[in-house]
Amino acid sequence: MKYKSANICLAMTGASGIQYALRLLQCLVDAGENVYVIISQPAQIVIDMETDLQLPSRPNDMQQYLTDYLNAKEGQIQVFGKDQWTAPVASGSGAPNAMVVCPCTTGTLSSIACGSSNNLMERAADVVLKERKKLILVPREMPFSEIHLEHMLKLARMGAVIMPPNPGFYYRPKTIEDIIDFVVARILDHLDIKHELLPQWGIDNNS
């Protein structure tokens, strides 16, 4: 099976904070990006708990649902199952330029740090690291244990960007959406995707 080329892979795990991932996907679609998407089964449970979405369980149905929900073009979002080893993200020759794991469980963090490739999500992260592409991990856990911190340090030394979803309040957010946008804006900055979610610090965009 042939797939459309995409520059970004977005993986969602079963950590709380799935709104960050859904908002990020919306922004990537709005920016015209093609996106590979991997959603773990625990992430599907979290989506059901934290949102009103009725996400189907089959990857093809999930892909159509997200395409319709986010008003994306056909083929702009491509969803892969955890055992879909023919997906481009499973090989260095088809690796995207960047991958974001958002939110990222500490279990997934551990597997990536140790080079495990037990499913497509872990393999995709392994490929991105070995190909020297950009890997952004958004670990949603509190507090972090020594093991968590050791894994983060190990991954940071490999070149991964560790980005806990810690919002800033100096711009005085008024809604939950404002807080979500702060985190998503920082992810987009590291993906070199232009956005208007937040003003740039110290820059007058009206001048």
Identify the function of each model-found stretch.
Residues 1-135, 143-207:
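A cross-family phosphate/adenosyl-ligand binding-site feature
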